[in-house]
């Protein structure tokens, strides 16, 4: 199990990585089908790894909040891992892939939709959950379930989201856990100030006239809400560096296991090099270290003229 995990994690930091089983096999003595079996149906406890990763993320973020007094931000959004539309004759299409409305592309996009939850404090941003949305449970229920499992933070904290996740159910669940919601609202949303039904656009117009300096989106001069943008950066990193758009795994279980290892790679980049740093800094450091060790081994092989088979494998 450890050898397969390491083969996958190391391959992430090598040139030409696309999340394919052939990429994983380049760093393993096993055939690519063996590694595919490990992801799709291998008997290993991915739930234990997931819970361990979640506990570590909570410990790091909550400890930072306790140390600095800064709020914890729980940030939620979703994205689509785009995949090619399958042929009508496909015998084994990718599981749990559907058409979803892409706001980024402005059209329907085929692939897997993921709901991501990030925890952040004082500039440290870590992925807490990356959940496959397969239409068997609503995204609102997914987020509510995650909110229920979070421990109460040591300081006043905030749940940041866009208008899709601003619902009574989610707001109430998060406030019970010590998180106040800061989120976007659709202008046609109905509110009941003083028991009177009003559209948000109407209330905004009234308060803009009656309340000096009223701004419906101002919270700490917008300093808190802009922290939500880090999840967009995370999605972009997953797609450009961690092969979220290009992995080739067919089974639903294999996909969720791959996403777990993708989150683990992000975690390693941020905290695994001996100090907290951005994902990009950690990624470049680990990648350059792997390359340096590879070239050092190549040099030693050439110098001593031993292990020629290993030398040729690395050189190729």
Say what each PLM segment does.
Residues 11, 41-122:
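Active-site-proximal, Lys/Arg-enriched surface segment
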Residues 130-226, 281-286, 312-314:
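An internal, acidic/charged active-site-proximal segment
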Residues 80, 222-249:
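Short amphipathic alpha-helical "interface-anchor" segments enriched in bulky aromatics
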Residues 244-299:
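Basic, amphipathic alpha-helical segments enriched in Lys/Arg and hydrophobic/aromatic residues
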Residues 24-25, 70-84, 117, 159-166, ...:
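Short, conserved catalytic/metal-binding motifs centered on acidic residues
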Residues 1-49, 53:
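Gly/serine-rich nucleotide phosphate-binding loop at the start of the catalytic core
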Residues 292-316:
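Charge-biased C-terminal accessory regions appended to nucleic-acid-, cytoskeletal NTPase
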Residues 1-4, 104-110, 248-259:
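Structural motif
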